[in-house]
A protein has these predicted regions:
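N-terminal beta-alpha lobe that positions the nucleotide/phosphoryl donor
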Residues: 1-166
């Protein structure tokens, strides 16, 4: 994980977040970049790809039953919100959050995203971590899953970086 202050001192930004984060860092905005690999490790550590594959197995992309998809999307969101991160990952997140110099009120969002999940946090950062997982769960909202099925023919998605910024 990389703070925007570290980025301003010359660390490399993730390529899929570089433009926005470099601008914010140059402006002196405090913040934290959670790399896509952190989300990927969460999915792998919780065996989520297999659980999600089994959950969505009844859905056929060629003939989507939206009535069947809706409760599955809700279950997927709950699965993301309730799956635990590995202890080492949680501690890494808390340490990075402490280094970021963020105020107590933050927004957790994707780079380029217009909206995010708000959090009022205090050390160690549990509320910010919960907001991060709520944001990740948005990828499994009915509309998001339906859009992936329509465009890619699959519910699968790629991990992406996440930003924590002052509100």
């Amino acid at each position: 994980m990389l703070t925007l202050a570290e980025l301003a001192r010359g660390s490399a930004a993730p390529p899929d977040a570089a433009s926005e984060t470099q601008t914010l860092a140059a402006q002196g905005v405090p913040g934290l970049i959670v790399p896509a690999g952190f989300e990927e490790a969460f999915y792998r550590g919780g065996n989520l790809p297999e659980q999600l594959r089994r959950l969505f197995a009844p859905i056929r992309p060629a003939r989507i039953d939206e009535d069947a998809l809706e409760p599955l999307a809700e279950q997927a969101q709950a699965l993301i919100r309730t799956t635990y991160l590995m202890d080492d990952a949680v501690q890494d997140f808390y340490r990075a959050l402490a280094r970021a110099g963020l105020p107590q009120t933050v927004t957790v969002r994707r780079p380029g995203g217009a909206t995010g999940e708000p959090a009022v946090w205090a050390p160690p950062g549990t509320a910010a971590l919960q907001a991060l997982k709520r944001l990740w769960a948005r990828d499994w909202a009915f509309e998001a899953v339906l859009a992936r099925l329509d465009t890619a023919g699959s519910v699968a998605l790629e991990a992406r970086p996440t930003l924590l910024l002052p509100t």
